[in-house]
């Protein structure tokens, strides 16, 4: 059996904004994709720019999927995430960036993140992100000199969603930044699920999109039509 491998790349940022709002990765955007991938028999590994334990945000114990992940061996592995510069992205079939506000601070600007995303794309891998995770794609230039997202269809946490959530905390509006780099951006109603697939670029709009995004990635890895 050919086991597929997905690399989760998480933030190391625990605070954001002028009031030092606690943040990190958004818990459901790891827990729900993990459940989908694990059920499909896909192997998951974890990395972050600095390595170690990624800070978390938004845990909801009333969500059974999150509760199960909280008490899983997987979260203990994630607490020992590998330093991204020590990971060979070519060992994986897909890379996935969960959201949370943290990625707006480190994932959005980290040079190693940009190198890994470009290398994964140029090697034919699936590149995926949800919510604020597409900040990873900003500034990524491919081997042929073109920006990764120019002319590509994608989604992310929308300006409308940010206005009611963290506009005072984030250093920029992600939707605006993606559009500025030439992305063909689309979003649905606030907090509703939306997944956009453009070739090997897979994106989800918000927390509600995390599970469906993972399902789309599984289908692609297993050779099913989109």
Specify the residue positions occupied by each region the protein language model found.
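Extended, subdomain-level signal for the structured scaffold at the beginning of enzyme domains
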Residues: 1-123, 127, 135-226
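Alpha-helical segment proximal to the catalytic Tyr-Lys
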Residues: 131
């Amino acid at each position: 059996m050919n086991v597929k491998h997905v690399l989760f790349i998480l933030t190391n940022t625990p605070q954001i904004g002028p009031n030092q709002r606690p943040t990190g990765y958004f818990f459901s955007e790891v827990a729900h994709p993990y459940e989908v991938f694990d059920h499909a028999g896909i192997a998951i590994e974890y990395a972050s720019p600095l390595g170690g334990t990624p800070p978390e945000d938004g845990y909801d114990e009333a969500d059974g999927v999150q509760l199960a992940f909280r008490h899983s061996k997987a979260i203990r592995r994630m607490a020992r995430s590998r330093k991204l510069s020590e990971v060979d992205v070519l060992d994986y079939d897909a890379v996935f960036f969960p959201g949370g506000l943290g990625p707006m601070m480190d994932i959005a600007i980290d040079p190693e993140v940009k190198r890994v995303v470009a290398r994964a794309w140029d090697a034919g891998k699936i590149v995926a992100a949800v919510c604020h995770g597409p900040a990873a794609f900003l500034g990524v230039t491919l081997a042929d000199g073109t920006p990764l997202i120019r002319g590509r269809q994608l989604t992310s946490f929308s300006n409308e969603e940010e206005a009611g959530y963290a506009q005072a905390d984030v250093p920029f509006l992600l939707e605006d930044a993606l559009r500025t780099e030439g992305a063909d951006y689309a979003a649905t109603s606030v907090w509703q699920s939306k997944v956009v697939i453009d070739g090997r670029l897979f994106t989800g709009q918000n927390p509600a999109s995390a599970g469906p995004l993972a399902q789309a990635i599984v289908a692609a890895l297993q050779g099913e039509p989109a």
